[in-house]
Amino acid sequence: MSLYGMIQRAGASGFGYNSTTDNVTEGLDLHGKTYLVTGINSGLGLETIRILSERGATIVGSARSEAKAREAMAGLPGPTFPLACELSEPPSVRAAVATVLAAGHRLDAIIANAGVMALPERTVHHGLEMQFLTNHIGHSLLVTGLLPALTPTGRVVMLSSAAHWQTYREGVRLDDLDAAKRYTSWGAYGQSKLCNLLFARELAKRLPAGQTANAVHPGVIATNLVRHVLPDALTGLWRSAGTALALKTIPQGAATQVYVATHPAAASITGEYWADCNVHKSSKHGRNDELAAALWAKTEELQTKL
């Protein structure tokens, strides 16, 4: 347990900062349920599919290639369905959607876990800044495409982050989505995480009663995402010193998305931002319904061109 974790207490849900995926699913029987999780080959995604499978669920797991997805799920005890989905390539996302629909899967939750973080250099692909394209456009295309497969009580869980507070001053730069005017690694990452939050907020309004959409902050965790942020020589120091002081373990970091996707107490809560397995207050941009609606409209416009 980190030093910061030692002073944290459980919230209204009965869980909190120190809760793990095992804690939040204790006593749950997920046999007969199916969960689609993106980015399963490492970190939070790998931990998420581990616990869901151990509780009896069927896993539809995606990675950038079917081989990577298959490898990640090789040791799971329950049924699995490997899926190739490169989120920065719209044709790959559409193919993944078609594969899932053709297979007839009924999804109890979609956990949009994959992402890229704080790319040091501005990277543009398909005319869009890479973090916006991958973290937001790719996932929004996947989720909306899979809505016909969502069960009547299905849940959508978008992996956002407290980094959404670090977005650009405007919130989402809808007139500069290729970051041509100005690029900062954390501003662009924060914008993409704000988009994940706003997407969940707007989707929650559009889903029929019984279905939910929420965004989650996993906490600060030493995962492979830091490979773009720190030199190799510092990554080990970040993991060891950071874990001792404040970082969550991976099972703690994945707990919130697993809780929101599975726990009966979260079944009727929608349109919220979660952290430490409890509803939290987001930034003012994260609560801006006009911005959420504008982002939704812009996203639909972009998707028709990709």
Q: What do these predicted regions represent?
A:
Residues 2-6, 13-229, 302-306:
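Rossmann-fold NAD(P)H-dependent dehydrogenase/reductase core
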Residues 202, 256-259, 298:
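Generic recognition of well-ordered alpha-helical segments
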Residues 119-120, 282-285:
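A generic structural signal for short coil/turn motifs at secondary-structure boundaries
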Residues 61, 85, 245, 284-287:
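Pocket-edge positions in alpha/beta enzyme catalytic cores
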Residues 286-306:
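C-terminal amphipathic/interface module of NAD(P)-dependent oxidoreductases
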Residues 177-180, 232-243:
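A short C-terminal helix-loop "cap" of Rossmann-like NAD(P)-dependent dehydrogenase/epimerase domains
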Residues 9-15, 192, 215, 240-280, ...:
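C-terminal helical subdomain
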